[in-house]
Curated annotation (Swiss-Prot):
This protein's GO CC annotations: cytoplasm
Protein name: Peptide methionine sulfoxide reductase MsrB
Broad EC category: oxidoreductase
Entry binding sites for Zn(2+): C55, C58, C104, C107
Catalytic activity: L-methionyl-[protein] + [thioredoxin]-disulfide + H2O = L-methionyl-(R)-S-oxide-[protein] + [thioredoxin]-dithiol
Domain MsrB per the UniProt entry, residue ranges: 16-139
Alphabetized SUPFAM superfamilies for the sequence: Mss4-like (SSF51316)
One MF annotation (Gene Ontology) recorded for this entry: peptide-methionine (R)-S-oxide reductase activity
UniProt-listed HAMAP family: MsrB (MF_01400)
CC cofactor note: Binds 1 zinc ion per subunit. The zinc ion is important for the structural integrity of the protein.
EC number: 1.8.4.12
Length: 143
């Protein structure tokens, strides 16, 4: 469900001073001010290890490695979140475009955007996510 306003209250309330201490400048700008890291520079763009991608702000599990695919766009791409409850979608009118912004549904951190040009044999969606908004927890591959 997309929200048009920025008035949603998230369960995890962030302390700005603590976030500035804990996050890198890029992580802070991406998650708190909807900045975008440069294409092909993110830590997880080409990661293929098995595991879970979590919100860098509140550690909510967001995406599984099994949903990750190489889109060629320069940012980590996933065809679905871990489940329908972990992300919040908001209409974004910035930069003269209309897009759907993706946020962590627990803390409201900006993650990236979702587009309808993902793998047609999956969901048809491409969650284009900034590496700076994520932490990766590796897990052994299932046999």
């Amino acid at each position: 469900m997309s929200h048009d306003s920025d008035d949603k209250t998230y369960p995890y309330q962030k302390d700005d001073a603590e976030l500035r201490r804990r996050l890198t400048p890029m992580q802070y700008e991406v998650t708190q001010h909807a900045a975008t890291e440069r294409a092909f520079t993110g830590e997880y763009t080409d990661t293929e290890d098995a595991g879970i991608y979590k919100c860098v702000v509140c550690s909510t599990p967001l995406f599984e490695s099994g949903a990750k695919f190489h889109s060629g766009c320069g940012w980590p791409s996933y065809f679905k979140p871990l489940n329908g409850e972990v992300i919040d979608e908001k209409i974004d009118h910035m930069h003269g475009m209309v897009r759907v912004e993706v946020r962590c549904n627990h803390c409201g951190a900006h993650l990236g955007h979702v587009f309808e040009d993902g793998p047609r044999d999956k969901t048809g969606l491409r969650y284009c996510i900034n590496s700076a908004a994520l932490n990766f927890e590796s897990r052994p591959e299932k046999e």
